[in-house]
UniProtKB/Swiss-Prot annotation:
Residues 187-189 form a propeptide. Palmitoylated by the ZDHHC9-GOLGA7 complex. Depalmitoylated by abhd17a, abhd17b and abhd17c. A continuous cycle of de- and re-palmitoylation regulates rapid exchange between plasma membrane and Golgi. It catalyses: GTP + H2O = GDP + phosphate + H(+). GO terms for biological process: Ras protein signal transduction. It is a lipid-anchor. This is GTPase NRas.
Length: 189
C-alpha cells in the first residue's frame, strides 16, 4: 500500500479542519475550534490503487507560523485552502506557496488550490480569479464545500494524483541520469 503525506494549509477559519474531517469521518463540523495541529490517516482506493493518506491539518493562525517550516518539510503535497467569502485568505495563498517552495527548496512541489465554502452565497473571490492564480502556478484548482461535501474527495484525490505524477517524474529523471553509467563487473580473488 502506498502512503501519501498530505498537508492542509491556509489562513485561520477557511475550513481546513472541516474539509479534513468531512473526508475522514463523513460529517460536517460547524463550530470553529482553532487547530494547532491534527493528524489523520485514512485508507482509500484512488484509480484502482489502495492508498494510505496521512493528512496533517495545520494551524492557520499567525502565532503558529513558526511550526510551519517543520510540517512543510515532511509533507509531499499541499492543499492550499482559502475561503471564497474571504479575500484576505485568497491573498494569503501566495505567502503559503512561497514558504512551501522555500522550505522544500524547489519550485516543483505538488499542490492543489482549494476554494472552500462554495455553498455560501456571499462570494468575494471570483472563480475566474482563482482559476487564473492556479493556472499561473501550474496547479489544479477545485472548489469545495465541507458542509455539502462538494469537491472534498476530488480535492484530496487530485493532490494524491499530483504527488503520484511527481514521484513518477522523479523516478524517470533518476533513471535517465543512470543511462550514461557503465557497469563493470568485479571479481573477488
Amino acid at each position: 500500500m502506498t502512503e501519501y503525506k498530505l498537508v492542509v494549509v491556509g489562513a485561520g477559519g477557511v475550513g481546513k479542519s472541516a474539509l479534513t474531517i468531512q473526508l475522514i469521518q463523513n460529517h460536517f463540523v460547524d463550530e470553529y475550534d482553532p487547530t494547532i495541529e491534527d493528524s489523520y490517516r485514512k485508507q482509500v482506493v484512488i484509480d484502482g490503487e489502495t492508498c494510505l493518506l496521512d493528512i496533517l491539518d495545520t494551524a492557520g493562525q499567525e502565532e503558529y507560523s513558526a511550526m510551519r517550516d517543520q510540517y512543510m518539510r515532511t509533507g509531499e503535497g499541499f492543499l492550499c485552502v482559502f475561503a471564497i467569502n474571504n479575500s484576505k485568505s485568497f491573498a494569503d495563498i501566495n505567502a503559503y506557496r512561497e514558504q512551501i517552495k522555500r522550505v522544500k527548496d524547489s519550485d516543483d512541489v505538488p499542490m492543489v488550490l482549494v476554494g472552500n465554502k462554495c455553498d455560501l452565497p456571499s462570494r468575494t473571490v471570483d472563480t475566474k480569479q482563482a482559476q487564473e492564480l492556479a493556472r499561473s502556478y501550474g496547479i489544479p484548482f477545485i472548489e469545495t464545500s465541507a458542509k455539502t461535501r462538494q469537491g472534498v474527495e476530488d480535492a484530496f484525490y487530485t493532490l494524491v494524483r499530483e504527488i503520484h505524477q511527481y514521484r513518477m517524474k522523479k523516478l524517470d529523471s533518476s533513471e535517465d541520469n543512470n543511462q550514461g553509467c557503465i557497469r563493470i563487473p568485479c571479481k573477488l580473488m
